[in-house]
Amino acid sequence: MSKTAAQPRVGLYPGTFDPVTNGHLDIIRRACTLVDRLVIGVAINADKKPLFSLEERREMLEAECAKLSVGGEIVVRPFDTLLMSFAQEVGAGIIVRGLRAVSDFEYEFQMVGMNQKLDPGIETVFLMADPTCQAIASRLVKEIARLKGDVSHFVPAAVEGRLKAKFGVS
């Protein structure tokens, strides 16, 4: 597909981002090389009981994305609908997903099958996690922070500060 000014390539990177990690930012940076506009969909998922509010997660993402040197546009938007409905709403032709391990692939493979039934015109693109980010998972970062461990290798400094504030760590 060729780039045209009339039809920019729009990608959607959905997730909970509770909190945003260096792994997420690596995928965002690399996804921006594939599309003209990347929409980061911050999922409202009550089942996950996030540590950070939707507004806090959106703020962290916007602040960290503003620091990235990318050529395309990045937009952060919350969503609480079906992923494919949201993708259609934002005009995304590509859904971007990061893969860290085989277990990620098994889950994502099932999701692609379902999503293709809902809208076969939207492709899913998988980006392998950078080797330096393969072990990073938001839930593990939160657990390490809760136990007063060092998360500086896994999240940006501002996010580390917010984690420390949440868990009362100085």
What are these model-derived regions, one by one?
Residues 1-170:
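Nucleotidyltransferase catalytic core that binds NTPs
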